[in-house]
Amino acid sequence: MAKKMIVSVIGAGGKMGTRVTNNLAKHQDTVELNFCETSEAGIAAIKERGFDTVPAETAVPASDIIILAVPDKIIQVVSVGIVEMMTPGSTLVILDPAAAVAKELALRDDCTFVVTHPCHPPIFNDETDMA
């Protein structure tokens, strides 16, 4: 069996984090999914869906892909901490293209950074509902 891709979603208990993890959870045969969340409400929401949370400090260094699904106002400070923990060759997906234009993201030369927007074509082409 092929090695599963390890994907960690930072902000997994929020609105966008929930949408992303709901879709990724459908592919557990090929994806090992880490739900990273710090808010009590977000952690409770993840547990209600039947999943456990993993601290970012544990999940990020082991991840192939990290998806940053956090509120715009904290993206700069969160990205600094996350990017420091990334393993060379890993990829950070950012759901806020304005943050990249505004140069609010921490970057590294040995990692890949992808910016997408949730209101544009989905990163999951099999979506049939809005949540």
Residue ranges and their predicted role:
Residues V60-E104:
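Rossmann-fold NAD(P) dinucleotide-binding segment
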Residues M1-R49:
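NAD(P)+-binding Rossmann beta1-loop-alpha1 motif at the extreme N-terminus of oxidoreductases
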Residues I6, L33-N34, D52, I65-I67, ...:
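Structural motif
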Residues G14-V20, I75-V78, I123-N125:
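Short glycine/serine/threonine-rich phosphate/pyrophosphate-binding segments
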Residues A12, E37-T38, V70, L95-P97, ...:
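Fold-independent oxyanion-binding glycine-rich loops
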Residues N22-A25, E48-F51, G81-E84, A106-D109, ...:
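Short, glycine/charged-enriched secondary-structure capping and boundary segments
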Residues L95-A131:
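Rossmann-fold dinucleotide-binding core
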Residues G50-S63:
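Short acidic low-complexity segments
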